[in-house]
Amino acid sequence: MSRKKTQPKKVVTPDPIFNSTIIPKLINSIMYDGKKVVAEKIVYEAIEKIKSKTKEEPINVFNEAINNIKPTVEVRSRRVGGATYQVPVEVKTKRAQALAIRWLVDASRKRKDKHMSDKIFNELYDAYEKKGSAVKKREDVHKMAESNKAFAHFRW
């Protein structure tokens, strides 16, 4: 056991334009080599495209897309008596948000569009309409948890 005090969690400064705490997390996960200005430009261009295409408030579309990607259950490996079981467990809200952002960025990077802002926009729009690779990833995780429901009593 560590004798050190537990560090307080860092507070995420909200986005200056939309006053959201999710957008800076998306920007940080897109960022390569510390080039935050480039990542911000990519995200804000994607949000502008959302605004022009949907004619709705872009932050609402963004939040709805993230909520459509967030998983509610996942599987964790648990070793019991020499056998490893995939045990379904509920996902905490912070982890669900982190997974949603990670899956969104991964799915966006795999798309064939030319610019990253187009990739992010298309993936967000697909997630808003409950389709796309990131939503498929969520469905796969849920399906995996559903198929391993028999091992739920191994939960710790």
Swiss-Prot record:
**What does the record give under GO molecular function?**
rRNA binding; structural constituent of ribosome; tRNA binding
Q: Where are the transmembrane segments?
A: none
The record's family statement is:
Belongs to the universal ribosomal protein uS7 family.
List UniProt keywords, sorted A-Z: Ribonucleoprotein, Ribosomal protein, RNA-binding, rRNA-binding, tRNA-binding
GO terms for biological process, alphabetical: translation
Q: What does this protein do?
A: One of the primary rRNA binding proteins, it binds directly to 16S rRNA where it nucleates assembly of the head domain of the 30S subunit. Is located at the subunit interface close to the decoding center, probably blocks exit of the E-site tRNA.
Q: What NCBIfam families does the annotation carry? A: rpsG_bact (TIGR01029)
Query: Partners and quaternary state?
Result: Part of the 30S ribosomal subunit. Contacts proteins S9 and S11.
This protein is called what?
Small ribosomal subunit protein uS7
Q: Name one GO cellular component term.
A: small ribosomal subunit
